[in-house]
Amino acid sequence: MKPIREFKSDEEFQKIAKDLQHKLFLDDWFIIFGLTDEPIRISGGYSSGLTTFDYGNREATILILNKDNWDYSADVAEYKPTVIKNCALLNLLHELLHLKREYIVPSDILGDGADELSEMEKKDVHTNLEKMAKTLFMMITGTNTDYFLK
């Protein structure tokens, strides 16, 4: 598969998203995939991807920023300048891995315990998801870490 910084069409995005859903063994999830040209507003700033889900019903929505030249460091004051370039395919993999992680320790099962995780533990989980997404990205596209640099 060729690396994709920005999807050319919604049709291309939907096809690839469904293919990756299948390859990650997430076929039992009902997922609505969407693209946006605007950074996604989250608490405390903006993001290039967002997943909302209900583990019990296995349903989710995944929204991906489809903008090649977005530099989140310019949009979010609390972020330092970044050397990583936005990549829609990487963002899609990252968001799908949020659902995959739910098979390991579902948030619904953690219940209130999820709130007891320290901010550092939450960041560590998210950092590891990003590392896994980058690893998968490089494996399926045949790229190396240089691809992510601006």
Predicted regions and their residues:
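Propeptide-to-catalytic entry region of secreted or membrane-anchored zinc metalloproteases
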Residues: 1-3, 28-42
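A short, highly charged nucleic-acid-interacting micro-segment common to nuclease
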Residues: 2-13, 122, 126
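Zn2+-dependent metallopeptidase catalytic core
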Residues: 8-29
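Active-site scaffold of zinc-dependent metalloenzymes
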Residues: 43-86, 103
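Post-HEXXH active-site segment of zinc metalloproteases
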Residues: 83-86, 102-142
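Active-site recognition of the HExxH zinc-binding catalytic motif
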Residues: 90-103
